UniProtKB/Swiss-Prot annotation:
WD repeats lie at residues 149-190, 228-265, 272-311, 313-349, 354-396, 404-442. A zinc finger (C3H1-type) spans 30-56, 109-136. The lineage of its organism: Eukaryota, Viridiplantae, Streptophyta, Embryophyta, Tracheophyta. Residues 1-29, 56-99 are annotated as: Disordered. Keywords: DNA-binding, Metal-binding, Repeat, WD repeat, Zinc, Zinc-finger. One of its GO terms (molecular function) is DNA binding. This is Zinc finger CCCH domain-containing protein 63. The keyword Transferase does not apply. Pfam families: WD40 (PF00400), zf_CCCH_4 (PF18345). It comes from the Eukaryota. The keyword Ubl conjugation does not apply. Disulfide bonds: none annotated.
Length: 443
């Protein structure tokens, strides 16, 4: 408990001098009837001191307080005694220990916020700092390394299957290539426009940019520019043999891959959203799209027709994923919603998980023990990890850890061998790994 430097002793004095239930008159206010706070802490250097350098005598039985009121209770309420239900764990209640918050061996309760001075390398409090000196909270995962190079927000991360190269895209208009063995940047490609998203599909690396999609075949070095989008391309996904792009003008463009010519050819344009399409996901022979217009649209991959529009979110729909037979969506309205099909095939909300902040991105993974975990990035610069023991009748989000960042985490990517990646608004990419044994967080 924090001790009130200005009013704490006064409250103790008032209780000792007469409070609720007292039949004797209140003693006159006099500094000589107050115990010196600095003397109690063992460091008073005033001579003479206007306050007492001894403890006040306690009231006799039945005097000064109501029934059942004891000196022990007075001491506990003033913040100077042993254990009480209001004290944090690890409080040393030994009478010989230092009192108040100055000294003693009391355990420091950590605030769930990274110390800014530690980030800058000049925190002098060490283990006694009330803020965290690490980038995560949790024992089942650990930070492996950090990849520095981007100067602005990381908007996409891709790890092609079977490749030893990691690709990251950023609003600094560059695509960086990283060697997975050494963690070193082996190439930087300046694209001349902000990168909105990055996708790996087979041998193809696809990058969303203003007014186009860039496509590279990393096996043959062939490249292609797919024109047609109006404004920034925010999201890319592949369904059956079609590539879909969500664009700033609210349309979804589709290209079909022609194996004979090794090229993507325009196929269709899906319209219906009134604002930018910021997220796409394919599952159960459906294309799901989330938009700044606060809606989710469900499209049939058979005929590319919209078969349902979901309107339960009250702000921008930021991310969509499918998990088993469920659709999960998140929004800047501070919620994660779980949708399930009802009779007739339409989706409805079966559970809403509320956060204190807007939710930016979702990613479903399995930990080292193959347990399902939901990664949930929020706009308070954190990534929350939730156990998902069931998405059936009894849905529950159980938090198992947090990852902290200097700015918002906007990109998440899963890798092989229990590895996953996060990219934040400063341009930092961090590499994490699930642990088979509990491991303390690394700085």
């Amino acid at each position: 408990m924090d001790f009130d430097l200005n009013g704490g002793n006064k409250r103790v004095f008032n209780r000792l001098g007469g409070g609720g239930g007292s039949t004797r008159p209140m003693a006159p206010t006099d500094t000589r009837q107050k115990v010196c706070f600095h003397w109690r802490a063992g460091r008073c250097n005033r001579s003479p001191c206007p306050y007492l350098h001894r403890e006040l005598p306690g009231p006799g039985p039945g005097q000064g307080q109501g029934p059942g009121y004891t000196n022990k209770r007075v001491a506990e309420e003033s913040g100077f005694a042993g254990p009480s239900h209001r004290r944090g764990p690890g409080f040393n209640g030994n009478s010989s220990s230092s009192w108040g918050r100055f000294g003693g061996n009391r355990t420091v309760t950590k605030t769930e916020k990274v110390c800014n001075f530690w980030v800058d390398g000049n925190c002098t409090y060490g283990d006694k700092c009330r803020y965290l000196h690490c980038w995560s909270k949790g024992e089942s995962f650990a930070l492996l390394t950090q990849l520095d190079g981007h100067e602005k927000l990381v908007s996409g991360i891709a790890l092609p299957s079977g490749s030893d190269k990691l690709y990251t895209g950023s609003k600094d208009e560059t695509l960086r290539v990283w060697d997975c063995a050494s963690g070193q940047c082996t190439g930087v490609l300046k694209l001349g426009g902000e990168i909105g998203c990055v996708l790996s599909e087979g041998p193809w690396l696809l990058v969303g940019m203003p007014n186009l999609v860039k496509a590279w075949n990393i096996e043959t070095n062939a490249d292609q520019s797919l024109s047609g989008p109006v404004g920034q391309v925010y999201s890319l996904v592949v369904g059956t043999d079609l590539l879909f792009a969500g664009t700033q003008d609210g349309s979804i463009l589709a290209w079909r891959y022609n194996a004979a010519t090794n090229c993507f050819e325009p196929s269709a344009s899906l319209t219906g959203h009134t604002l930018a399409v910021v997220t796409l996901y394919v599952g159960a022979n459906r294309l799901y799209s989330g938009s700044m217009d606060k809606t989710i649209k469900v499209w049939s991959l058979d005929n590319l027709q919209c078969i349902q529009t979901l309107t339960d979110h009250s702000s921008v729909v930021m991310s969509l994923i499918c998990w088993d037979q469920f659709l999960l969506s998140c929004s800047l309205d501070n919620t994660v919603k779980i949708w399930a099909a009802i009779e007739g095939g339409n989706l409805e909300v079966t559970y809403t998980h509320k956060e204190e902040h807007g939710v930016l991105a979702l990613c479903g993974v399995h930990d080292a023990e193959a347990k399902p975990v939901l990664l949930c990035a929020c706009n308070d610069n954190t990534l929350r990890l939730y156990d998902l023991p069931s998405l059936g009748l009894f849905i529950r989000f159980t938090e198992r850890g947090k990852i902290f960042a200097k700015q918002e985490i906007r990109a998440i990517q899963i890798g092989p061998g229990g590895i996953f990646f996060t990219g934040d608004g400063t341009g930092q990419v961090k590499v994490w790994k699930w642990c088979t044994e509990p491991t303390a967080a690394l700085p």
